[in-house]
């Protein structure tokens, strides 16, 4: 039985869609859980923010933004809003890396934010055409 190039293309498209949804759901879950923990000032997050030198009210702001980003990533339509959510998450995760480096934390503290940066970039790169902007910005 021969597989046509059309069959390979459809299989590739299906794998890409599955990879998109896996990365996006994982990212959105992190946003919702992390957002709630930040907005509600979960004690481990409080300790981390104090260690990094940030004011605690910043947790509420970031927590709400995280929740909104998680909803935006999963919601149908609104491709521009999704672009903003992805950008905000990348800014946040790379900012977390910079903050941990600035206070002299070890390499292991960078694994989480680097992993989530990669997840955000992967989700963004894999998104289907229905979730992309129709034109260049």
Language model features with spans:
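Membrane-interface extramembranous regions
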Residues: 2-137
């Amino acid at each position: 039985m021969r597989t046509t190039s059309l069959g390979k293309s459809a299989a590739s498209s299906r794998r890409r869609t599955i990879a998109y949804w896996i990365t996006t759901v994982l990212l959105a879950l992190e946003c919702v859980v992390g957002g709630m923990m930040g907005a509600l000032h979960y004690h481990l997050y409080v300790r981390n923010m104090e260690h990094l030198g940030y004011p605690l009210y910043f947790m509420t702001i970031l927590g709400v933004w995280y929740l909104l980003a998680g909803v935006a990533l999963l919601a149908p339509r609104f491709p521009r809003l999704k672009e903003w959510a992805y950008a905000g998450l990348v800014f946040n995760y790379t900012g977390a890396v910079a903050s941990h480096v600035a206070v002299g934390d070890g390499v292991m503290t960078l694994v989480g934010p680097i992993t989530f940066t990669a997840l955000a970039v992967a989700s963004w790169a894999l998104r289907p055409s229905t979730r992309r902007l129709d034109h260049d910005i």
